[in-house]
UniProtKB/Swiss-Prot annotation:
Post-translational modification Phosphoserine, affected residues: S86, S172
Gene name per UniProt: CHL1
Cofactor: [4Fe-4S] cluster
Organism of provenance: Saccharomyces cerevisiae (strain ATCC 204508 / S288c)
Cofactor binding annotation: Binds 1 [4Fe-4S] cluster.
Similarity comment: family membership: Belongs to the DEAD box helicase family. DEAH subfamily. DDX11/CHL1 sub-subfamily.
Subcellular location per the Swiss-Prot or TrEMBL entry: Nucleus
Taxonomic lineage: Eukaryota, Fungi, Dikarya, Ascomycota, Saccharomycotina
Subunit: Interacts with ECO1.
Catalytic activity: Couples ATP hydrolysis with the unwinding of duplex DNA at the replication fork by translocating in the 5'-3' direction. This creates two antiparallel DNA single strands (ssDNA). The leading ssDNA polymer is the template for DNA polymerase III holoenzyme which synthesizes a continuous strand; ATP + H2O = ADP + phosphate + H(+)
UniProt-recorded name of the protein: ATP-dependent DNA helicase CHL1
Keyword match Nucleus: yes
Record's miscellaneous remark: Present with 98 molecules/cell in log phase SD medium.
PROSITE patterns linked: DEAH_ATP_HELICASE, HELICASE_ATP_BIND_2
EC number: 5.6.2.3
Pfam families linked: DEAD_2 (PF06733), Helicase_C_2 (PF13307)
Length: 861
């Protein structure tokens, strides 16, 4: 199949919509032309994920096919070097040798695909038997060094004993030594081993099948060298549930082999990367409740004398039959994250480390944002983006995510609680701690007291910038001490021991008092432990850059915030072949260009904003021109606006929309919604509206109302959901079909300009404009647009909840006269802009609404 046919079909499993073809062609063209960035907006419900898969996998397989063809051509034209043959050999001998080498590598590729097919037809219970058979065929030569050890390890004591809370002896001045050896019984750390193990870059597929990589005679895997894919597709998203949706979509299409008839059946080598919290199978580690504690407990166990029964940091473990069997089982079919845990348990092999070992073979890798966006995490996991395709989905949150990864915040209350926790821990275990641990805990406590005193003495207003050197003025704390304390926290794993000990005390006290910990407290248990927050904050203190700023935030907090997200993103851009930023609501795209890609030439950036797959008659967007409906900061509390105009609009709309269809309205803040509800309740308007439609409203600390609203809609009683922009219901929840036949945006949801974060960001942006030669007017314009972009991104994200598939229908109501202004209107998503109705007065809007739903009712008969 030639390139034209590839680009026309993309092996989509269904007949694609026009916008899906448009998106696939754009992605394929970007990759073929070597463009660096693609920013793609495709509304939710338009098959965006499947289109991205089809386009990128088609290009990937075509690219590998081109490499294979060039390799065959090089053999025919004698362009390769047959270093194992003498220059005096006849040409026909050299040619025959080259062909035989190529054929040998192709045979190995074919053998591996057949091997994966064998696994795919074998149940998990038969897997060990199959491994033994494979050994007879010479695929696995090593003896499983762990089997005997695992047999006697079925019953593990996972209860928390006092010994679990005590760190290993720590030498206070050992920072100049190899800490992995001095504190871990001579074992080498994973990071040190990994960095030396896979340091060479893989450029083309020919490098992998040319036979030049020396083979370890103790390596029992005959496929280890031949199946490493130099160009990969890395797909990152915000949550594991979103990554799971990608997995289900990847199962739908089928792609041809890169090697044509030479290797007729080439499976998609898919690898889902996840954290130890998702993949760990050791009960001694999983008894801890937070990700940070699990990571530290894992490291503690692996480097202990006892070790982990499911993993060893040795070549022997990497090439033992069960480890290789788990790796191959991962690639035998498209496995989800949840599939890896039972597979690992059935073989007694750690799925987390086995999946890391499988990375070189993978074609497609899914990973959470943190794994991709944090350079240190990529390094520790040996994620090499060189010449690969990086897809970042749900990218409307990308800038905020980068900022949060490289930022840190600690409050006065956090510091006091951490101080109290250390004192409690120290008083309990001081007689059982060696001098190194005691000294460092006292130093850490002294540092906390210094920070507490600094906040109490210096906090004056939110947004007040802080010189980090001022935090320790007049104290005996200096940067060197902080570096040593950070080393201590990292090596000793003291953070999870202190935090979990104090949590155990709370649970024990609660049990004695027969007063179970409230649900809200249980939720906090899984949040980040305090001492980890402290260590992150200290890390920011010791790694100062000009791109960040310390300042005071609300609740007597000190925050470090990254101000230039483009800096850490540069490393991804520099390594990857192409970065695709995709999402359902990517407007305004100017935000990405100015904040994330300022140094990328415009000719290297491709943008696409797709329309929706629904027929045009299935969506209407209304913007009122009534001056009374203006929710500015000065006017929004007006009794006339709230009790008359806003209330009457909801009453009229509730009557115009059929009762079987729900209405979802988004308010700019919890405070404003609470004000509206209070006003309506004071004069019985709330009861009046509630008689027309059952009202459900979101409260900041309230219970989940979605299930009640959904049940009410299902019963056809007429329901109205009042939600918050940026709240629990504005993102990630699909209000499809009758759950939302009308979505209302009340006002323009500008962020709080008095928050410390926005004060510092706006000041930084204005200073940057002035520094580059701009005027005060230009700086003012830039900060104004910055605020507008935040606002309109939130609008697009909220109204995008309404339409979820091709047959869905709904109306959008933008309830503020300011939406008529070009600067706001042009920042709406394209599919929303294209659906704007010319009706402007509320009377006209309601009349048009009745006609809209009347037509839907007639068409459904």
């Amino acid at each position: 199949m030639d390139k034209k046919e590839y680009s026309e079909t993309f092996y989509h499993p269904y007949k694609p919509y026009d916008i899906q073809v448009q998106l696939m062609e754009t992605v394929y063209r970007v990759l073929s032309e070597g463009k660096k960035i693609a920013i793609l907006e495709s509304p939710t419900g338009t098959g965006k994920t499947l289109s991205l898969i089809c386009a990128t996998m088609t290009w990937l397989r075509m690219n590998k096919a081109d490499i294979f063809t060039r390799m065959e051509t090089n053999i025919k034209t004698n362009e390769d070097d047959s270093e194992n043959l003498s220059d005096d050999e006849p040409d026909w001998v050299i040619d025959t040798y080259r062909k035989s080498v190529l054929q040998e590598k192709v045979d190995l590729l074919n053998d591996y695909e057949k091997h994966l097919n064998e696994i795919n037809t074998t149940s998990c219970k038969q897997l060990k038997t199959m491994c033994d058979l494979d050994k007879e065929h010479g695929r696995y030569k090593s003896v499983d060094p762990l089997r005997k050890k695992r047999k006697g390890a079925r019953h593990l004591d996972v209860s928390l004993e006092e010994q679990d809370f005590i760190p290993r002896p720590y030498e206070s001045d050992s920072e100049n030594n190899d800490t992995s050896k001095s504190t871990r019984g001579g074992r080498i750390s994973d990071k040190d081993y990994k960095l030396s193990e896979l340091n060479s870059q893989i450029i083309t597929l020919l490098d992998k099948i040319d036979g030049k990589v020396s083979r370890d005679p103790n390596n029992g895997d005959r496929f280890d060298v031949t199946n490493q894919n130099p160009v990969k597709i890395y797909y990152a998203s915000r949550t594991y549930s979103q990554l799971g949706q990608f997995t289900s979509q990847l199962r739908l299409p089928s792609f041809p082999s890169s090697f044509r008839d030479k290797v007729p059946d080439e499976k998609v080598k898919y690898l889902p990367l996840a954290s130890k919290k998702q993949l760990c199978i050791n009960p001694k580690v999983m008894k801890w409740k937070t990700l940070e504690a699990i990571n530290d407990a894992c490291a503690d166990l692996r480097h202990s004398k006892e070790g982990c029964i499911f993993y060893q940091n040795t070549n022997e473990w990497r090439h033992c039959p069960d480890t290789l069997a788990l790796r191959d089982m991962i690639f035998s079919e498209i496995q989800d994250i949840e599939d890896l845990v039972p597979l690992g348990k059935s073989l007694g092999i750690c799925p987390y480390y086995a999946s890391r070992e499988a990375l070189p073979i993978a074609e497609v890798v899914t990973l959470p944002y943190q794994y991709l966006l944090s350079e240190s995490t990529r390094s520790s996991l040996q994620i090499n983006l060189e010449n690969s395709i990086v897809i970042i989905d749900e990218a409307h949150n990308l800038i905020e995510t980068i900022n949060s990864i490289y930022s840190s915040q600690i409050s006065l209350e956090d510091l006091k609680n951490c101080h109290k926790g250390i004192v409690t821990y120290f008083n309990k275990f001081k007689s059982r701690l060696n001098p190194g641990n005691r000294v460092n805990l006292l130093k850490l406590n002294s540092l906390l007291m210094t920070l507490i005193q600094f906040i109490v003495k210096n906090f004056k207003k939110i947004g007040q910038e802080i010189d980090p050197n001022d935090m320790f003025t007049g104290s005996n704390i200096d940067t060197l001490n902080i570096h040593k304390l950070l080393r201590y926290i990292k090596v000793s794993k003291i953070a999870y021991k202190i935090d979990t000990y104090n949590q155990a005390l709370k649970e024990e006290e609660s049990s004695k008092n027969e007063n179970p910990i409230k649900e809200t407290h249980k939720k906090s248990v899984s949040s980040q432990p305090l001492l980890f927050k402290v260590s992150q904050f200290l890390y920011c203190l010791t790694n100062l850059t000009s791109e960040g700023q310390f300042f005071f935030e609300k609740n007597y907090s000190i925050k470090y915030m990254l101000l230039e997200p483009s800096k850490p993103f540069e490393s991804i851009l520099n390594q990857a072949k192409c970065v695709v930023l995709a999402g359902g609501t990517m407007e305004p795209m100017s935000e990405f260009l100015s904040n994330l890609l300022p140094e990328v030439p415009s000719e290297d950036i491709t943008t696409l904003s797709c329309n929706h797959v629904i027929p045009k008659e299935n969506l209407q967007t209304y913007i009122t021109n009534q001056p009374e409906l203006e929710f500015t900061f000065e006017k929004r509390m007006s009794p006339s606006l709230v009790n008359n105009h806003l209330f009457q609009f909801f009453v009229d709309l509730s009557k115009a929309v059929p009762k079987k269809g729900g209405i979802v309205a988004f308010f700019p803040s919890y405070q404003y919604l609470a004000h509206v509800i209070q006003c309506w309740k004071q004069n019985d308007r709330f009861a009046t509206l509630n008689n027309v439609r059952k009202i459900f409203y979101e409260a900041k600390d309230g219970d989940d109302i979605l299930s009640g609203y959904s049940d009410s809609v299902a019963e056809g009683r007429g329901s109205l959901l009042l939600a918050i922009v940026g709240g629990k219901l504005s993102e990630g929840i699909n209000f499809q079909d009758d759950l939302c036949r009308a979505v209302v945006m009340v006002g323009l949801p500008f962020p709080n300009i008095f928050s410390g974060e926005l004060i510092v960001k706006r000041k930084h942006l204005a200073a940057k404009i002035m520094k580059s030669g701009g005027t005060e007017e230009e700086a003012s314009r830039a900060t104004k647009e910055f605020m507008e972009n935040i606002c309109m991104k939130a609008v697009n994200q909220s109204v995008g909840r309404a339409i979820r598939h091709a047959n869905d229908y709904a109306n959008i109501y933008l309830l503020d006269v300011r939406y008529n202004r070009p600067n706001f209107r042009k920042k709406l998503s394209r599919w929303v802009q294209d659906s704007i109705n010319s009706e402007h007065t509320t009377h006209q809007v309601i009349s048009s609404t009745r006609k809209f739903f009347s037509m839907r009712s007639l068409n459904s008969r």
